Amino acid sequence: MPYSNLHPSIPRPRSYRFKLAAFVLLVGSLMSLWMTGEPPSHTLHYLALHVASQQLGLLLKKLCCLAEELCHVQSRYQGSYWKAVRACVGSPICFMALILLSFYFYCSLENTSDLRLAWHLGILVLSKSLSMTLDLQSLAPAEVSAVCEEKNFNVAHGLAWSYYIGYLKLILPGLQARIRMFNQLHNNMLSGAGSRRLYILFPLDCGVPDDLSVADPNIRFRDMLPQQNTDRAGVKNRAYSNSVYELLENGQPAGACILEYATPLQTLFAMSQDGKAGFSREDRLEQAKLFCRTLEEILADVPESRNHCRLIVYQESEEGNSFSLSQEVLRHIRQEEKEEVTMSGPPTSVAPRPSLLSQEPRLLISGMEQPLPLRTDLI
């Protein structure tokens, strides 16, 4: 089952298969070394040399990086040379401890080869400098993507949080009150269970026209919700408005809802069209999917916002020529109504209390020996 329920093409977060594959490779290499029949001391000697060489190679790379960062101490590190060193080298304690431990095992074990340590270090410096000069160890695109997702460096992450904090968080809490005001003026147009939410469209190709009737003529503008005004970033009474659309099916009105596109998708599309942004169509598609996933995760942690909006993610190129945006929106509205009925449950009928006329007749027998006359004045 896909991680996101919005669209099957939205990727899941990366798991730990990378480390699992490395562990399997570790076990396989240990078994192959054991099958060679070499003495353990000989294997440990070369393992220590190789680990020390790797760590020294990383240290050389970090020192070259430090040479560049020292020229930007004032602008990037607030004049702190220690911050620049930490940014390039990371944690020097663990790093140096591993190098010293590797050299200890290398020097304490018997050297079975005729090659001296100085020769090994010379070859190490030569190979590492050649690799950095020719950029032979650059990260693969998948590695860059994994780092950006893990550290939240993606464009989509910032856009999703900006869209939530700067827009959805402001309008969703008061949406139901504005809908009630609208219904009083427009004969309960948004009275259905599926019409009391904000429906946000997410075309993954980021094609966002300014007029919804251009995307589908069966989507017809009806009116505007009452505006919401709030002071925001120095702007007094900044107005936030939403549009109400009527959906047609077979030429007849089939529903009405509050409908709009996710405006950050326009930003992604504009970036892919501007060469200075360095944003390809593949980057745009990836960031659009991550934008949807991040926004879904944000709303999942905020129930008061999640229950007032619904995300509609679609990709027209994959759906084919038969795709209809109005039908997709109607499908979500009807699904919302079904979920509302399921959550509320079937109506419970309360059995009425039996009246006196519906009771069985009972014979009342007096405990007196003689019957009384009907006239009370004779008593």
Curated annotation (Swiss-Prot):
Residues found modified as Phosphoserine: S241, S355, S358, S366
GO biological process: activation of innate immune response; antiviral innate immune response; autophagosome assembly; cellular response to exogenous dsRNA; cellular response to interferon-beta; cGAS/STING signaling pathway; cytoplasmic pattern recognition receptor signaling pathway; defense response to virus
Reported effect, E150A: Abolishes response to 2'-3' linked cGAMP and 3'-3' linked cGAMP and production of interferon IFNB1
Effect after changing S145A: Abolishes response to 2'-3' linked cGAMP and 3'-3' linked cGAMP and production of interferon IFNB1
Lipid positions (S-palmitoyl cysteine): C88
Placement of covalent cross-link Glycyl lysine isopeptide (Lys-Gly) (interchain with G-Cter in ubiquitin): K151, K236
Localization (cell): Endoplasmic reticulum membrane; Cytoplasm, Perinuclear region; Endoplasmic reticulum-Golgi intermediate compartment membrane; Golgi apparatus membrane
Post-translational modification: Phosphorylation by TBK1 leads to activation and production of IFN-beta. Following cyclic nucleotide (c-di-GMP or cGAMP)-binding, activation and translocation from the endoplasmic reticulum, STING1 is phosphorylated by TBK1 at Ser-366 in the pLxIS motif. The phosphorylated pLxIS motif constitutes an IRF3-binding motif, leading to recruitment of the transcription factor IRF3 to induce type-I interferons and other cytokines. Phosphorylated on tyrosine residues upon MHC-II aggregation. Dephosphorylation by PPP6C leads to inactivation and decreased production of IFN-beta.
The UniProt record lists the keyword Electron transport: no
Motif range (pLxIS motif): 363-366
Subunit record text: Homodimer; forms a homodimer in absence of cyclic nucleotide (c-di-GMP or cGAMP); 'Lys-63'-linked ubiquitination at Lys-151 is required for homodimerization. Homotetramer; in presence of cyclic nucleotide (c-di-GMP or cGAMP), forms tetramers and higher-order oligomers through side-by-side packing. Interacts (when phosphorylated) with IRF3; following activation and phosphorylation on the pLxIS motif by TBK1, recruits IRF3. Interacts with RIGI, MAVS and SSR2. Interacts with RNF5 and TRIM56. Interacts with TBK1; when homodimer, leading to subsequent production of IFN-beta.
Function: Facilitator of innate immune signaling that acts as a sensor of cytosolic DNA from bacteria and viruses and promotes the production of type I interferon (IFN-alpha and IFN-beta). Innate immune response is triggered in response to non-CpG double-stranded DNA from viruses and bacteria delivered to the cytoplasm. Acts by binding cyclic dinucleotides: recognizes and binds cyclic di-GMP (c-di-GMP), a second messenger produced by bacteria, cyclic UMP-AMP (2',3'-cUAMP), and cyclic GMP-AMP (cGAMP), a messenger produced by CGAS in response to DNA virus in the cytosol.
The protein, known as: Stimulator of interferon genes protein
Gene (name only): Sting1
